[in-house]
């Protein structure tokens, strides 16, 4: 694990993995129903199945990244998850309230930063 990585690379990779693990566990255990209802309201077919698949993708990718196993595959999995989750949950253009719209734009920008970090991980 982590052969030929600088200490800073290890810290960065572990922080990225921790972000995905923490949100994946939190959302799976305490926010599952809320996310499922939002997806149903958006017309996502088979919302429960899609949500379970998304959480599996998120948690598996984060675990692979934390263990530095198949790092490039993990980065691609998490990248795909991040893009799909952003398209489903951060549809800022549909939100009339300026404050809530701003929060969704901010979350989308954070997700873009995560994608940048994943791209760097894949390039190591």
Report each predicted region and the residues it spans:
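Extended, low-polarity transmembrane helix blocks
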Residues: 1-34, 45-60, 66-124
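Flexible, solvent-exposed coil segments and beta strand-coil junctions
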Residues: 40-44
């Amino acid at each position: 694990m982590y052969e030929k990585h600088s200490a800073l690379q290890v810290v960065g990779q572990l922080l990225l993995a921790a972000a995905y693990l923490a949100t994946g566990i939190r959302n799976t255990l305490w926010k599952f129903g809320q996310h499922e209802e939002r997806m149903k309201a958006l017309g996502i077919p088979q919302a429960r199945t899609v949500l379970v698949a998304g959480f599996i993708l998120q948690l598996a990718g984060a675990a692979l990244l934390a263990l530095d196993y198949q790092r490039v595959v993990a980065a691609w999995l998490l990248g795909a998850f991040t893009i799909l989750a952003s398209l489903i949950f951060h549809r800022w253009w549909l939100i009339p309230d300026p404050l809530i719209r701003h929060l969704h734009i901010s979350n989308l920008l954070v997700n873009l930063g995560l994608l940048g970090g994943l791209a760097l991980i894949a390039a190591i």
